[in-house]
Amino acid sequence: MKIPQKISLKLLILFLLINLGEIMAQQLPQYTQYMYNTATINPAYVNENNRMDATLSYRAQWIGIDGAPETKALTVSGIINNKIGLGINIFKDNIGPSTEFSSNAVFSYYLNLSKKVKMSLGLNAGIDFFEVDYSKGSYYDQDDILFSYDNYYNALPAVGAGIYIFSDNWYVGFSVPNMLINQSNVESDKNLIHRDNHVYFMGGYVIDLSASLKLKPSILVKTIDNAPPTIDASLNVLFLQTFTLGASHRLKDSYSALAGFQISKNFFMGYSYDYSISDIGNYNQGSHEIILKYLMPRWGPNARSPRFF
């Protein structure tokens, strides 16, 4: 079968939505390198050792499809006196004619469950701005009243929570980044912008193969109302506390290759490539994701964390 060089995702998505009689807001962004920036999906996670970190990420999904998802994100987080975590999560997500901008403040509190095991409880609160520009793209039904608008804007509150339990070599977590099921009437009861709940379960274990080599298998399960669960299984290796290599499989969706490099004591860069195996894989050249993390100087004791997560 000849694969078209470029197709319009706007047309495909809007054709389906019109037939369903419902406009859905963008769901939360998808990340392949979530293990390097867990705070994006769990407000209970922050870096340890009395320091802040700032992470920039960029994801271009389904290269070759016009209007495919594109995500830019900034996360800043840290812990004070090994007890209180503070941070912000900001992202901008584009797909077809729709754009979402989200800004959240994050607070977490750490508890010692034992000498080796800690637990963090986290909350996030903020606001999501949503826009649909109906002037973009071509539509199946040009006479639909919904598309007579030039633009649609809305702002919706967001409140989430999470829990993160960990030791030096393992972790488990549970989070709901937005517990509010938001919806807004566009024109009639059948045309709604809304977001379903996202629930994340995560876990990982670090195996010390030698003094300079660590192996970390991990899993992330994401469930969304009225949709099948998404399961990410990954395996990452850390060499000399400097280089990371990994592979990941998103069940029935994609295979991924990951690489990271600790450029200096304060800078880390990561890259991932997703090869799509779903039906839409016939029409795209994969997905790219880049992250850049800056570890700010410590303001407390200069103890190096043994964690590889």
Q: Where would I find each of the regions flagged by the language model?
A:
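Bacterial N-terminal signal peptides
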Residues: 10-22
